[in-house]
């Protein structure tokens, strides 16, 4: 992604003398107290590096398909029905199940995605203290950044195959472990070992799902080196 602009950040609000060698941009919407043109109403800024992004569906947006529609992966901003994402995992999964007896109902899938998001929120808010992860997931008020639920939804079709012929409750636990593994591996600023990471080496099926989830998630990120 090319630079659209950069904000000067004061020390103590994300500005540093030395650049982070592995910075992943995380955008928040800029709030203005005066009426603005529509083009200025969708300006987001990364307070980690100062870059800003105009979220208007242009080529600078990273459009992804979620269970609720097309959003920009950089901001979580809903783009409406007229935009086409480059990757369409939800469309693909619907096409794959058209000729199958067991089809996924939209309400059922939506419920599963919300369950995963809620569990991830509580886990990373209460139990995870790994440097870099909390900052990437939560804003200054402790709420999930809007693009995180969108990314959870975006990669969820990778997990649907695990639910076939298995107890949903047990599979949700596995899926949560996979998400925790993927999120920590992407956002942690240091190498992490131990129980926090999903032990997938003995299960090639889970390992393949985790790899695909990570690839999809990483494909949406703006990385600064």
Swiss-Prot record:
InterPro entries xref list: Herpes_UL92 (IPR004289)
Coiled coil: none
Protein keywords: Early protein
Chain spans, region Disordered: 1-20
Annotated Pfam families: Herpes_UL92
Family note: Belongs to the herpesviridae UL92 family.
Function: Part of the viral pre-initiation complex (vPIC) that is responsible for the expression of vPIC-dependent late genes. vPIC is composed of at least BcRF1 that binds the viral TATT box, BDLF3.5, BDLF4, BFRF2, BGLF3, BGLF4 and BVLF1.
The name this protein goes by in its record: Late gene expression regulator BDLF4
Organism field: Epstein-Barr virus (strain B95-8) (HHV-4)
